[in-house]
Structure formats: structure tokens, C-alpha cells
């Protein structure tokens, strides 16, 4: 059930939710730092050693051969293949609109200023292994990179107990245009992508979710390479009016609660009656879920509700929390969209469940968490590009404007800067 709190306590709620960020303890950071250093020095040998140690699999090589890749794909269910093809179309349709070109500005006296938009050359995608397998994450990470124009997109994922990869992951990688797959996970995979080994070339950026050791590794290699984010636990906030269907609201709250005992599920509503019905539905629906224990722990610790005086007040509180997923389960949701300032992704209306965005709708499901939607964005084509400016001044232009450059440089006491302009004005 959701614990009701009062509007006056919203600041405490916000701090409580933000405290769920992964605690990268000193012990974890030291362990991961040692793994990274080992991979930097010993490369493939270290990677294979850690695969044996952590995944209990002895491999001769990390790279997935084309034969193995194709063989795994053949094991996929036809209905899964159909669903993934449609999801890919939707994701591509949405992300293609994000692609932008550069520009050129021409001014008087032979001055040209421009900006080039260039794709990164190589990107590494981390895909978790273990019991869970997330082919949707492969599409969400790889397709924007390919649309951006990244030529080399590689994927790392831990091998299973048989030393291979899950068929659904293999198919998703092929569908998304991944160029190579390597059977390696954990901090050692992040280190290999960041620094390179005999088998794995270094990349420019690493994206994708992982456990606390993967998160620590991403944090430690940031600066050597770029990363997407250090993601916290999943979160959903539902704004619902009195006409919202309690069954729908409960189902959507549970869709995030089942992720993790630290996942948060928040309901902001104008109806005390709806809150009561939602709590009844949560008990009913959670009782039959395979991950019942995780759901119960999540709701006990991070399932909260506030009854507000208006939808505007609900959205105002939501803006302070800045949730990863925001659902506006209200009448005329488009009219209220402009009031939303901070949210990773917004789901409008009674029928737009958050799962649509997770798998199929086309918007990206790699979203800012832990309140970072106040200043950061979902993964997109922009995540895989860099912008470079260029400038051209003619002889006429430097003679006309060089004195101003010299004046500013001299005021900053950087005489060599001033001289660089001065010598061209002779």
C-alpha cells in the first residue's frame, strides 16, 4: 500500500527519494579501481581471468563469432521478433527527428563562422546479464547511436553459464545494427571499453545500465571516455484526477516497483477516494506478481501518496521531485503539459501506460533519475554527437578588427594573445 503523507512534508519526501542513489562506498571504489588497473596493464588476460572468477565461465575468446551470433538468433520466438521489429520502427521514427546539421554564418569583410555536427567514432553499450535480459535496452541505446552516424557500435554483456549470450539479446543487437558483441561483464568490461585490449578497441563513450560495480567503473573512467549517466533506482510518479481508473493507476505504479526494492512509486491525486481504491488494487494485483516480495518492499519504503487541492498543485509538487517517469492520468492532459518543467519522460492520458515508453512507443527509456531531470535529459541522438566550431577571418577582416582583439587581450594581461593579432595588422 501507499503511505499517505501531507503536502507540508513534500520537501522531506524529495530528500528521502534522492537518498536512494547508489552508494559507491570506498570498498567498492577500491575494488573497481584495482580491476580497472589490472585490465589497463594485462588487457585480455585480465578480462578472461575476471570472467572465470565472477561468471564461472572459461572462455578462449571474448568476441562473439558470426556463427554463434546467428545460431542464437535462430532460437528466438517469432512473436518476439515481430514485436521487436515494430518497436525498432517506432524508435527510429522518433529519434530520426532529433538529427540536426551544422550551420554557417557569413559576415562582412570576409568573415565566416560555422558549426559542424559530427558523430562519435566508437560507442560501447553495456547490457546486463544474469537472470534478467533486456533486449529493449539494446534498441534504446544502439539505435540513436546509429542514427547519429556512429560507425563502430559494440556491445559487452556477461556470458551465461554455457559461455554464450541470450538469444533475445543477440537478436536485438543484430536488429539495432550493433557491429560486434563481446562476452564480458562487470567493471572489467567498462575498463576494456575505456582503455582497450588486444581484442576490444577503446571507445569514445560508454552507455547502458549495470550493477553498483559497473556504476563505479563508469564513474572512475569518466574523463577518459564519456558516459551516459550514473543511474539510480527506477521511479514513477502518477498525477491522477477523480476520473482515473484505480486499476490502471495501481498497475502502473507496480510496473516500476517490481524493478527494485529501492524503486519509488508516488501518487499525487485530487481524490482521497481514488487513493483508497488504488491501495485496494495494489494489494490485489501485487498478490499474484512473480516479484511480489520486491514489490512489497518497494511500496513499503518508497510508495507514497499526497492528496492535493488541484491538478496544478500536483504538477507543482511533481516538478520539485523531478521524476524519471511522470504520468498525467487526468482529463485534457495536453492542456497541462506546459506546466510540467522537470520530468524524464511524460505519459499523457488514461491509456498511456509507462510500459509503452519502456518497450514500444519510440521515446527513449534511458532517463534521468534521482531528481536529475531538473538539469539532464533522456538518451538521444544528441548523446552520440559532438559539435565543433570553425572560424575564418580574411586579411581585410583582421586589419579591421584586430585592434579590438588586441585591446581585450591586453586588458587580460595576455600579451602574446595581443601580439598574435597585432602582427597581422602590419
Predicted regions: what they are:
Residues 1-121:
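N-terminal Rossmann-like NAD(P)+-binding subdomain of aldehyde/semialdehyde dehydrogenases
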Amino acid at each position: 500500500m501507499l503511505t499517505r503523507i501531507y503536502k507540508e512534508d513534500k520537501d522531506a519526501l524529495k530528500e528521502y527519494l534522492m537518498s536512494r542513489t547508489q552508494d559507491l562506498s570506498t570498498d567498492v571504489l577500491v575494488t573497481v579501481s584495482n580491476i580497472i588497473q589490472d585490465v589497463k596493464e594485462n588487457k585480455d588476460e585480465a578480462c578472461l581471468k575476471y570472467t572465470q572468477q565472477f561468471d564461472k565461465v572459461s572462455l578462449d575468446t571474448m568476441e562473439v563469432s558470426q556463427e554463434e551470433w546467428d545460431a542464437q538468433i535462430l532460437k528466438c520466438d517469432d512473436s518476439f521478433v515481430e514485436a521487436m521489429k515494430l518497436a525498432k520502427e517506432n524508435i527510429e521514427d522518433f529519434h530520426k527527428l532529433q538529427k540536426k546539421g551544422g550551420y554557417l554564418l557569413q559576415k562582412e569583410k570576409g568573415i565566416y563562422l560555422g558549426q559542424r555536427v559530427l558523430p562519435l567514432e566508437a560507442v560501447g553499450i553495456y547490457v546486463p546479464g544474469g537472470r534478467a535480459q533486456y533486449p529493449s535496452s539494446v534498441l534504446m541505446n544502439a539505435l540513436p547511436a546509429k542514427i547519429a552516424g556512429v560507425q563502430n557500435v559494440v556491445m559487452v554483456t556477461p556470458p551465461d553459464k554455457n559461455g554464450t549470450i541470450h538469444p533475445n539479446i543477440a537478436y536485438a543487437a543484430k536488429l539495432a545494427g550493433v557491429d560486434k558483441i563481446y562476452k564480458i561483464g562487470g567493471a572489467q568490461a567498462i575498463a576494456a571499453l575505456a582503455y582497450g585490449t588486444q581484442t576490444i578497441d577503446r571507445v569514445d563513450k560508454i552507455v547502458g545500465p549495470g550493477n553498483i560495480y559497473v556504476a563505479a567503473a563508469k564513474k572512475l573512467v569518466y574523463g577518459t571516455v564519456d558516459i551516459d549517466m550514473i543511474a539510480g533506482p527506477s521511479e514513477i510518479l502518477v498525477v491522477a484526477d477523480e476520473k482515473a481508473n484505480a486499476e490502471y493507476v495501481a498497475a502502473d505504479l507496480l510496473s516500476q516497483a517490481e524493478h527494485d526494492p529501492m524503486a519509488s512509486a508516488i501518487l499525487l491525486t485530487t481524490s482521497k477516494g481514488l487513493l483508497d481504491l488504488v491501495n485496494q488494487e495494489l494489494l490485489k494485483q501485487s498478490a499474484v506478481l512473480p516479484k511480489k516480495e520486491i514489490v512489497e518492499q518497494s511500496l513499503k519504503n518508497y510508495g507514497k501518496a499526497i492528496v492535493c487541492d488541484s491538478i496544478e498543485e500536483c504538477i507543482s509538487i511533481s516538478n520539485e521531485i523531478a521524476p524519471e517517469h511522470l504520468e498525467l492520468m487526468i482529463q485534457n492532459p495536453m492542456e497541462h503539459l506546459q506546466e510540467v518543467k522537470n520530468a524524464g519522460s511524460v505519459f499523457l492520458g488514461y491509456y498511456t501506460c509507462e510500459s509503452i515508453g519502456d518497450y514500444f512507443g519510440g521515446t527513449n527509456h534511458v532517463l534521468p533519475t534521482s531528481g536529475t531531470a531538473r538539469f539532464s535529459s533522456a538518451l538521444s541522438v544528441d548523446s552520440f554527437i559532438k559539435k565543433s566550431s570553425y572560424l575564418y577571418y580574411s586579411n581585410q577582416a583582421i586589419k579591421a578588427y584586430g585592434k579590438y582583439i588586441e585591446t581585450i587581450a591586453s586588458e587580460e594581461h595576455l600579451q602574446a594573445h595581443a601580439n598574435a593579432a597585432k602582427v597581422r595588422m602590419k
